[in-house]
Every structure is written in C-alpha cells, then in structure tokens.
Amino acid sequence: MLKDTLKVKNLVMKYGKSYLNTGSSSVQIALLTRKINYLQKHFILHKEDHCGRKGLLNMVSRRRKLLDYLKSNQYENYLFLIKKLGLRH
C-alpha cells in the first residue's frame, strides 16, 4: 500500500504544480490513466469480470470528458499530457 501511495504522490508532483494539487485536470487524467492501465491488465486474466468492465468504461468516459475540457481550455497542456501519457487524440 505504501508503494501505491508513493506512486500516486509522484504522479501528482509530475503533472500538478505541487503535491497538494490533486484536483487539477492534468493530475486527474494521469491518475485515471494509471487505473485504466491496471484494469486492462486485470481483464486479460479475468475475462468474465463484467462489473469491473463497467467501472472501466466509466473511467474511460470520465477521462475523455476531462481531456475534452483540457483541450478546449489549455491546448498546450493537453498536447503535453497526451504525448507524455501515450494517448491518442
């Protein structure tokens, strides 16, 4: 658990302005991407986890909405983020 919280804090420091800046769009997108990547690996082993798959789709939808917001308001930050996280636009 300690490793996980340290990874989250590192992501917040990397994409936010400070370690307390957990609410910014960039940080939320980075954290959602981390969770989505974990769940994608989970579904390789657990193909019939339909409830978890619904949660994954909700996370992808939330990330898409945040990316759309970032694209319309902070385009340079949007381009930096999708390049850094390896996302398509």
Swiss-Prot record:
What the entry lists under InterPro entries is as follows:
Ribosomal_uS15, Ribosomal_uS15_bac-type, uS15_NS1_RNA-bd_sf
One Pfam annotation, family name? Ribosomal_S15
For this record, an example GO cellular component is: cytosolic small ribosomal subunit
Q: Which GO terms describe its molecular function?
A: rRNA binding; structural constituent of ribosome
Q: Name one GO biological process term.
A: translation
Query: Coiled-coil region(s) at which residues?
Result: none
Per UniProt, the keywords (alphabetical) are: Ribonucleoprotein, Ribosomal protein, RNA-binding, rRNA-binding
Q: Would I find RNA-binding among this entry's keywords?
A: yes
Q: Which NCBIfam families match?
A: S15_bact
Question: What role is this protein assigned?
Answer: One of the primary rRNA binding proteins, it binds directly to 16S rRNA where it helps nucleate assembly of the platform of the 30S subunit by binding and bridging several RNA helices of the 16S rRNA.
UniProt xrefs under HAMAP family:
Ribosomal_uS15_B
The subunit field of the Swiss-Prot or TrEMBL record says:
Part of the 30S ribosomal subunit. Forms a bridge to the 50S subunit in the 70S ribosome, contacting the 23S rRNA.
Question: Its family?
Answer: Belongs to the universal ribosomal protein uS15 family.
Name of the featured protein: Small ribosomal subunit protein uS15
- The gene coding this protein: rpsO
